[in-house]
Amino acid sequence: MKQSSPTYLKHHFLIAMPHMADPNFAQTVTYLVEHNEQGAMGLVINRPSGLNLAEVLEQLKPDALPPARCQHIDIYNGGPVQTDRGFVLHPSGLSYQSTLELGELAMSTSQDVLFAIAAGTGPEKSLISLGYAGWEAGQLEAELSDNAWLTCPADPAILFDLPPEERLSAAAARLGVNLSLLTAQAGHA
């Protein structure tokens, strides 16, 4: 019998199935930053936290007044792990103190990217989140086999150009799926 190598889903969207019971992930779309034999890490991209960049910058530098445009830059709930830690997804090409290149995208985790965005010298498009979603080795694969998620290749246009309330249905539409027509019952043939 031929052994097949595992399929990893780095740079894919995880689309929560309608029956997802976990409140951290119900009705979410998650961008997978990393997925390998050791586990997976992703950022939920359609859950605004209610915070904006101005509020975050006020905490980082209480003595400086953030530019007014920062009040219109949303901060997202990236997931339930390390919710005090910031992650910025942006197109590749710009590098900061702590930037991980992900192909056509990059993820920066240092404060300098936030100050660059505030100053208007940072990436033109970005998604700023607090926290991340993490899976131990084999955990995501088990959830996939339980039909908890749909997957599709990530699309930066969905990530950066659509309002958050449209991202879930747009990601599902890439697969030709209308989530409102799916049943909560799952099975295997």
Swiss-Prot record:
InterPro entries: AlgH-like. Pfam families: DUF179. GO terms for cellular component: cytosol. Transmembrane segments: none annotated. Gene3D superfamilies: VC0467-like (3.40.1740.10). SUPFAM superfamilies: VC0467-like. HAMAP family: UPF0301. PANTHER family: UNCHARACTERIZED PROTEIN YQGE (PTHR30327), UPF0301 PROTEIN YQGE (PTHR30327:SF1). Belongs to the UPF0301 (AlgH) family. This is UPF0301 protein AlgH.
